[in-house]
């Protein structure tokens, strides 16, 4: 987990880890190689959720989710929809969803991506307590399955997963 005050560089750091922006100092390595020296194929292992949810506002929540070609397990999709309590809004355009409902839609897409590395900027923002607990459970399942999670947070950590805290100071 990457911790730090607002403006300390948490978002900049995770965007650099993803290869979206360059670091002013230091290097990001993937399998012991600097990401500057390899092609972008390492990004195929990363599922990223930033402050913007990456959804298409004009289409429904379910259409956003099912655009993901990796969805093969409809039982898991149904479990996620139920776990995040999105059943009643699946057919609604994202533009009329609350920020929490849109965030849950984006989180379902991230979880269903089957990527080994989840990178999330403030994943608990805009979520109700039940959804925070459900997301924490899903993150624990991901790390128990040998997945890795890099995330920023201004809140406490509910996860049972092993972690390394990185604290940024301004």
What residue spans do the PLM features occupy?
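Helix-to-loop junction immediately C-terminal to a conserved catalytic motif
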Residues: 18
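Conserved ABC ATPase signature
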Residues: 93-100
């Amino acid at each position: 987990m990457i911790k730090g005050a607002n403006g300390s560089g948490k978002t900049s750091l995770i965007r650099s880890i993803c290869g979206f922006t360059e670091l002013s100092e230091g290097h990001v390595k993937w399998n012991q190689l600097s990401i500057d020296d390899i092609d972008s194929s390492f990004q195929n292992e990363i599922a990223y959720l930033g402050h913007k949810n990456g959804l298409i506002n004009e289409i429904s929540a379910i259409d956003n989710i099912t655009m993901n070609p990796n969805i093969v397990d409809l039982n898991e999709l149904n479990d996620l929809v139920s776990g995040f309590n999105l059943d009643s809004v699946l057919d609604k355009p994202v533009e009329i969803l609350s920020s929490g409902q849109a965030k849950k839609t984006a989180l379902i897409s991230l979880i269903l991506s089957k990527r080994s590395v989840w990178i999330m900027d403030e994943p608990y923002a805009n979520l109700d307590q039940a959804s925070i607990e459900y997301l924490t459970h899903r993150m624990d399942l991901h790390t128990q399955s040998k997945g890795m999670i890099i995330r920023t947070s201004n809140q406490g950590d509910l996860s049972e997963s092993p972690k390394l805290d990185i604290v940024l100071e301004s």
